[in-house]
Amino acid sequence: MDNMVFLLIKFYIFFVILFLLGRAFIIINSKIFKLNFHEESKLQGIDIQIFYPVLGIFFLGNFLYIFNYFLPLKNKLSYLILLFIFINFKHPIYYEKLKGILKTLPIYIILLATSYDINFHYDAGLYHLNNQLWLLESNIVAGFSNIYGPYGVSSIYEYLSAFLWLDRSFMLVHFLSLVFIGFFYTFL
């Protein structure tokens, strides 16, 4: 039971970081493009707060892709993206508007059960983990798919996964998938 409580705490810290990165992304874009952003904004009739974690993933992934042109992802400077979280404190967060996010908590608790005794899929060892390790150790390599064909068809998800190699369990990589699955279930 202690392990599940630890996973729950770890997931919600991860979720809050993605939420704040997504909100910072919206705030930055509203300043750059002079948009009228406010917490009551809706996207196709849906509260914009629901989209913050996915936008945070988008923002983080694109930052890591650009960063990897110059430096490997294991460089400590890659964590500077987390400074964007402080942009949230310049604009107040209306906690009563976060009720929609709080309604998704049971969905994520149920999804966290998939984290118990999880193992790698066979193609993780075939090329995903090797590709992610390469992204961590070096900046972008021209002709990367000439080394091994599947390396050339990787996506921004590989950059995100490589960045999340913070512990030996690779649980944060699994949490990334849970955010997408939970986002899908919020619309059902």
At which residue positions do the language-model features occur?
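Glutamate identity and glutamate-enriched acidic tracts
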Residues: E39-E40, E96, E137, E158
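Internal/C-terminal transmembrane anchor helices
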Residues: G100-S115
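Short hydrophobic/aromatic-rich motifs at helix boundaries and adjacent loops
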Residues: H38, G100-T104, L129-W134
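Membrane-embedded, hydrophobic transmembrane alpha-helices
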Residues: M1-Y95
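Active-site lumenal/periplasmic loops and adjacent helix-entry segments of GT-C-fold
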Residues: L112-L188
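Residue-identity detector for glycine
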Residues: G22, G45, G56, G61, ...
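Short, aromatic-rich membrane-interface segments at the entry and exit
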Residues: L73-I81, G100-I101, D123-Y127, V173-H174
